[in-house]
């Protein structure tokens, strides 16, 4: 405790024996031990009291924190945070009101200035030359017209070729037994009909095909009639000799 060695203790004991005497030394040592024990007890009591005080302080802190947590309200913190923003908004509103109020004053002061007489308007004569409302028409290029004429001539040539082929087939389908008078009469009649018919638009391929089929049917009927006439004549000739014999 006091950093005293054995040699120092021996020196102290010798001094005490010499000074105090051998008779009074034991009771003095007892009294010294009792005082040391009392001091130790006092120190222990002080420590216990100090520890209890620390514990109570810690408990008080804990209790205070718990009470703070219970009493904590987020709305209050939000209000505290929004207060500076509200102040800024109020300042901006006041600045805007101040900025608008001078403009109103200026407008009120400028009103009598506008009440002064206005100079009469000068009538400016309109110019004689007027521009057309629509832009001038641009002449179309001749190339598209030539292309259109070539495209129109191609279907005409194709139609003429198809008509020639259909007529050739109709002529080939006619029977050889038709008399020359009919053969001679048909071109004349066709020429007459063609001359009598008014100028009509060129027939399409479908109409030409229909006409060719009609001509084929008429030719077949005429062939059947021509074949039936010689058969009837032969039958009548054969019937006449039988009657003569009877």
Curated annotation (Swiss-Prot):
Record-annotated membrane-spanning stretches: 1-21
Phosphoprotein in keyword set: no
UniProtKB keywords: Cell inner membrane, Cell membrane, Membrane, Protein transport, Translocation, Transmembrane, Transmembrane helix, Transport
GO molecular function, one term: protein transmembrane transporter activity
Record text on subunit structure and interactions: The Tat system comprises two distinct complexes: a TatABC complex, containing multiple copies of TatA, TatB and TatC subunits, and a separate TatA complex, containing only TatA subunits. Substrates initially bind to the TatABC complex, which probably triggers association of the separate TatA complex to form the active translocon.
PANTHER family assigned to the protein according to its UniProt record, in alphabetical order: SEC-INDEPENDENT PROTEIN TRANSLOCASE PROTEIN TATA, CHLOROPLASTIC
Protein name: Sec-independent protein translocase protein TatB
Source organism (scientific name): Agrobacterium fabrum (strain C58 / ATCC 33970) (Agrobacterium tumefaciens (strain C58))
Lineage: Bacteria, Pseudomonadati, Pseudomonadota, Alphaproteobacteria, Hyphomicrobiales
Originating gene: tatB
């Amino acid at each position: 405790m006091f950093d005293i060695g054995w040699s120092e203790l021996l020196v102290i004991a010798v001094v005490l024996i010499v000074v105090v005497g051998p008779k009074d030394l034991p009771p003095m040592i007892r009294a010294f031990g009792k005082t040391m024990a009392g001091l130790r007890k006092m120190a222990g009591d002080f420590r216990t009291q100090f520890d209890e005080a620390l514990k109570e302080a810690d408990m008080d802190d804990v209790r205070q924190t718990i009470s703070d947590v219970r009493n904590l309200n987020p709305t209050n913190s939000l209000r505290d945070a929004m207060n500076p923003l509200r102040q800024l908004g109020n300042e901006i509103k006041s600045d805007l009101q101040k900025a608008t109020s001078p403009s109103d004053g200026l407008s009120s002061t400028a009103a009598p200035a506008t009440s002064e007489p206005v100079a009469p308007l000068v009538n400016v004569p309109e110019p004689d030359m007027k521009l057309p409302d629509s832009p001038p028409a641009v002449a179309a290029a001749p190339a598209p017209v030539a292309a259109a004429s070539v495209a129109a001539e191609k279907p005409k040539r194709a139609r003429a070729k198809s008509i020639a082929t259909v007529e050739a087939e109709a002529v080939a389908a006619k029977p050889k037994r038709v008399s020359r008078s009919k053969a001679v009469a048909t071109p004349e009649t066709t020429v007459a009909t063609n001359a009598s018919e008014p100028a009509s638009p060129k027939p399409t391929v479908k109409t030409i095909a229909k006409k060719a089929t009609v001509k084929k049917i008429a030719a077949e009927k005429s062939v059947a009639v021509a074949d039936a006439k010689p058969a009837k004549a032969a039958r009548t000739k054969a019937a006449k000799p039988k009657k003569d014999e009877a």
